């Protein structure tokens, strides 16, 4: 059975990346054909940045790389699930996961954010300065 | 801290839904403002179907509903992570998760799909016939 990813009009599939140990969702990102190929070939996570319009090896600036334990695809092959060993933190804010806040009801149909994990594993200002 | 979802040009955020017990990724879908509000207000998962261009309560046809245990959002608030109690199967093919196949290298840079979980918990032909 061939892997035939169904790219959207921008040439991308959605990628969900989880921590292979804890199961936590670390991040949601996108991959183009080249990012998929490089991820499969190297066993390291590569993505495509929509804001920078560029291929991107996870951790190339921060050192916070992701080793792929397993890659899956969904029923219609327009999404990919990576289970990874995360080195350090996945989030550019320095948190282990990008999903470090939960959404809680706040009356009148509103909602507020509450920190689940505020700890920073690195200092973004130090890591990303050029 | 207010929850201020960052909708894309189509008015959607990406939603990753995981099984609160196993941690498995069940599905990737989208939510518009109304789907988010209804999910928060009712504690049941609502999505927006891009193919049908319609709001959709998960399980309204199949009975395979999702009770929300926790909702999180990511660093830039353009994605949501739902941890749910899945009743039956999340996938329209009858499998528990939409991610029932893994992607494996197949030499020459190619890749093939291998079933991780082929079992169907319901018969789609019976459930979705009108």
From Swiss-Prot, chains A, B:
Its EC number is 3.5.4.19. GO terms for biological process: L-histidine biosynthetic process. It comes from the Bacteria. Pfam families: PRA-CH. InterPro entries: PRA-CH, PRib_AMP_CycHydrolase_dom, PRib_AMP_CycHydrolase_sf. Keywords: Amino-acid biosynthesis, Cytoplasm, Histidine biosynthesis, Hydrolase, Magnesium, Metal-binding, Zinc. It is found in: Cytoplasm. Its cofactor is Mg(2+); Zn(2+). It catalyses: 1-(5-phospho-beta-D-ribosyl)-5'-AMP + H2O = 1-(5-phospho-beta-D-ribosyl)-5-[(5-phospho-beta-D-ribosylamino)methylideneamino]imidazole-4-carboxamide. Zn(2+) binds at residues 75, 91, 98. Homodimer. Catalyzes the hydrolysis of the adenine ring of phosphoribosyl-AMP. This is Phosphoribosyl-AMP cyclohydrolase.
């Amino acid at each position: 059975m061939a892997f035939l990813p169904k790219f959207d009009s921008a040439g991308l599939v959605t990628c969900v990346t989880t921590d292979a140990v804890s199961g936590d969702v670390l991040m949601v990102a996108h991959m183009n054909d080249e990012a998929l190929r490089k991820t499969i070939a190297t066993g390291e996570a590569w993505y495509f940045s929509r804001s920078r319009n560029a291929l991107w090896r996870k951790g190339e600036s921060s050192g916070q790389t992701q080793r792929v334990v397993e890659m899956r695809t969904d029923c219609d092959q327009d999404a990919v699930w990576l289970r990874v060993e995360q080195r350090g933190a996945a989030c550019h804010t320095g948190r282990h996961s990008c999903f470090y806040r939960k959404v809680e009801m706040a009356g009148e149909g509103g909602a507020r954010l509450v920190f689940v994990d505020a700890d920073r594993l690195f200092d973004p200002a130090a890591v990303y300065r050029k």
